[in-house]
Amino acid sequence: MSDLQPWQWPEPTWRELVGRARAGRSLKPAAWPNGARCAVAISFDADHETIPLRDNDPSPMRISQGQYGNRQAMPRILKLLERESIPTTFFYPAVAALLHPEEVRAVVADGHEIGIHSWIHEANTTLPREAER
């Protein structure tokens, strides 16, 4: 298998790999609350400027692309979620939360959940084990 690329793996190989990670029992309830036919989970990654910072590319163009989320998208998203009474989770890299504390306060004030999304959106698959700890 080591000589093959993932797209070249035979079906038993990828089925076995995926099977290792499968959760145990089904979490689907016998009936959803209020007669609903399904459940939906909505979350947002509020990465903002952390991707270009992580990539060591603090060019004004890349930073301004990251700022779009805070300046334009987030107010619209919060307004939509409030109008539709949709609770959600916003995942923030710590650096993004430190750069935009007023946004984090607004998210919390609207009753949404905050989740941590790394320090600066590290590419954790490339980190040495000791750095990841």
Predicted regions: what they are:
Residues 2-133:
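Catalytic alpha-helical scaffold of carbohydrate-active enzymes acting on polysaccharides/glycoconjugates
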